Amino acid sequence: MQITDVRIRKITSEGKMKAIVSVTFDNEFVVHDIKVIEGQNGLFIAMPSRKTPDGEFKDIAHPINTATREKIQSAILAEYEKVKNEEETKTETEE
């Protein structure tokens, strides 16, 4: 399974959630609403989830092993940093 596209759909500087991302696998399957979160130990991803009636959050889709999670997280965070740096450069040149 290959990650064929990572799209940063929304970037925010407020709060702990920094971005919302969509990831495409093998040009055939997409997972939307993956969040980039800033935690105590740096950035990490949170898979799409829904709130259950008892207030607990359950993942809708998620990797079932650590290696796959790390592969997805690395691809997302690399694209996030790239897009964030492009936006910062664009803002600086407009000033």
UniProtKB/Swiss-Prot annotation:
Keywords linked to the UniProt accession: Cell cycle, Cell division, Septation
Family from the record: Belongs to the SpoVG family.
Stated role: Could be involved in septation.
Record protein name field: Putative septation protein SpoVG
Gene Ontology terms describing biological process: division septum assembly; sporulation resulting in formation of a cellular spore
Source organism superkingdom: Bacteria
